């Protein structure tokens, strides 16, 4: 586990190793992590022998509490005629706790319980978006972007792309200037097709092409129109002015 990308590539290229490489852990999603997932998945897609790994871990294991919070309550002594109401006090802001937050001695490895793809409140952490991007099974690649040509690769092994549509947007200096869609994607599993999108490249500025693959009909856990894969391609990159001559 936790082979580096270059160790994984060395294993995949070595003919002495005939068994597939599947890491029992390889992506410790602690803090703002996951920045080298692309390096791993470029190799996974390049070498059939390298077949992936298990992310550590799914969800942060922190516990939800309000620090210094005293709840509303009623109190009474045995001799009291009536109960007394005491309003709650303290900080109402929530926090997520772990390990030594409940003991004088921290028996855990500090904040190692907070290392999930999603947070204790089940909200997505930043690396969840990177993980979803690298795991997507539909890819748009440039062919001749000035002429509107891209290729669409269906990475699925058992299903075609009949339930997806391609939605494209052309941006000039960050602003959408043209858009359209391809309603029918006739791409078989593990196959690639070339499409020509009917846009005109603006004469000036940075030009980017956003490509989204959206569901035509709902599927389990996913809604109609949901984007399940996407790509941004540079039609023309931004050009900086030439540096001034030395003084």
Whereabouts are the PLM-identified features?
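Sterically constrained small-residue positions within well-ordered secondary structures
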Residues: 122, 143, 159, 186-188, ...
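Acidic/polar residues at beta-strand termini and the immediately following turn/coil
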Residues: 86, 144, 215-217, 247
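Surface-exposed beta-strand edges and their flanking turn/coil or helix-capping segments
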Residues: 12-15, 36-37, 68, 165-167, ...
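Short beta-strand elements
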Residues: 218-244
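Beta-strand-rich N-terminal accessory domains
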Residues: 156, 210, 215, 239-247
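Extended substrate-binding grooves/exosites of carbohydrate-active enzymes
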Residues: 1-151, 155-162, 167-176
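Intrinsically disordered, low-complexity Pro/Gly/Ser/Thr-rich segments with frequent PxxP/GP/PP motifs
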Residues: 165-214, 218-221
């Amino acid at each position: 586990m936790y082979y580096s990308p270059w160790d994984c590539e060395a294993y995949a290229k070595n003919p002495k190793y005939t068994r597939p490489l599947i890491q029992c852990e390889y992506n410790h999603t602690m803090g703002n992590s996951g920045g080298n997932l692309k390096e791993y998945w470029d190799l996974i897609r390049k070498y059939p022998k390298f077949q992936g790994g298990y992310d550590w871990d799914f969800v942060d294991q922190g516990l939800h509490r309000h620090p210094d919070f005293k709840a509303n309550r009623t109190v009474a002594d045995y001799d009291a005629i009536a109960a007394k109401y005491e309003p709650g006090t303290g900080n109402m802001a929530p926090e997520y706790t772990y390990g030594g937050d409940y003991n004088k001695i921290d028996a855990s490895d500090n904040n190692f319980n907070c290392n999930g793809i999603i947070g204790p409140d089940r909200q997505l952490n930043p690396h969840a978006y990177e993980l979803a991007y690298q795991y997507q099974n539909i890819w748009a690649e440039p062919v001749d972007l000035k002429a509107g040509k891209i290729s669409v690769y269906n990475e699925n092994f058992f299903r075609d792309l009949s339930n997806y549509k391609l939605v494209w947007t052309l941006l000039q200096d960050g602003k959408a200037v043209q858009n359209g869609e391809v309603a029918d994607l006739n791409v078989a599993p593990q196959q690639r097709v070339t499409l020509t999108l009917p846009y005109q490249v603006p004469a000036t500025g940075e030009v980017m092409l956003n490509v989204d693959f959206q569901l035509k009909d709902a599927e389990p856990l996913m809604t109609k129109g949901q984007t399940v894969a996407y790509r941004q391609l540079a039609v023309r990159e931004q050009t900086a002015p030439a540096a001034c001559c030395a003084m």
